[in-house]
Amino acid sequence: MRKRILVSACAALAVFAAHMPTALAAATDQLQSFVTGVKSAKGEFTQRQVKGQGDSLKVTGTSSGSFVFSRPGKFTWRYAKPYEQLLQADGQTLYIYDKDLNQVTERKLDGALGSSPAAILFGSNDLEKNFTVKNGPTRDGVEWLELTPKSKDTQFERIGIGFKGGNLEAMELRDAFGNTTLLTFSAMQKNPQLPANAFRFTVPKGADVMKQ
């Protein structure tokens, strides 16, 4: 489940930056600043699965780790707790490494992202082609944008992106079954210097490789 969420959820900021509609950018100064100024970043994340609505919200699972990205299409998303797992893309191929199984899954990057939240964070396709974008509410000082996938063949029915003080604060992903995944970001460094081989994936010794 967690792997599906991240393949569906991790990859979205680069595309958003490259293809965001001008009218929407003018409406949100924080977003415009982030879009034009941040070409790469690294930081930490916490991912929570939430069920219910209103006062009946219940956290059913929590995981955390770190991320690095460089637009377009290059990223490392590393789960550290409660289980280790790695998702890494070099601009062409997405690699998913499950340490417990010692197994690597390879997927073509464009096919893996599509109209998923991942495409908003790290992809390179046309945002307006895949999403309807509108301004959302302000909650606890965080300004939200709401994205609705145009494709019916997607796991999520709504995606929220929250900014505060010019920084990406959170993403909120709601699926067709009413479940919500909340990603919160911290310790983000904008435009860090990254080595040339930062996103080169090396298959761990003895790992099985599956291509999809």
UniProtKB/Swiss-Prot annotation:
InterPro entries: LolA/LolB/LppX, OM_lipoprot_carrier_LolA-like, OM_lipoprot_carrier_LolA_Pbac
Predominant localisation class: periplasm
Record bears the keyword Magnesium: no
GO cellular component, one term: periplasmic space
BP term (GO), one: lipoprotein transport
CDD domains reported in the protein's UniProt record: LolA (cd16325)
Keywords: Chaperone, Periplasm, Protein transport, Signal, Transport
Signal peptide residue numbers: 1-25
UniProt KW Chaperone keyword: yes
Localization, UniProt: Periplasm
Domain of life of the native organism: Bacteria
Record's subunit section: Monomer.
Family the entry assigns: Belongs to the LolA family.
Free-text function comment from the UniProt entry: Participates in the translocation of lipoproteins from the inner membrane to the outer membrane. Only forms a complex with a lipoprotein if the residue after the N-terminal Cys is not an aspartate (The Asp acts as a targeting signal to indicate that the lipoprotein should stay in the inner membrane).
Protein name per its UniProtKB record: Outer-membrane lipoprotein carrier protein
Organism annotation: Cupriavidus pinatubonensis (strain JMP 134 / LMG 1197)
Gene for this chain: lolA
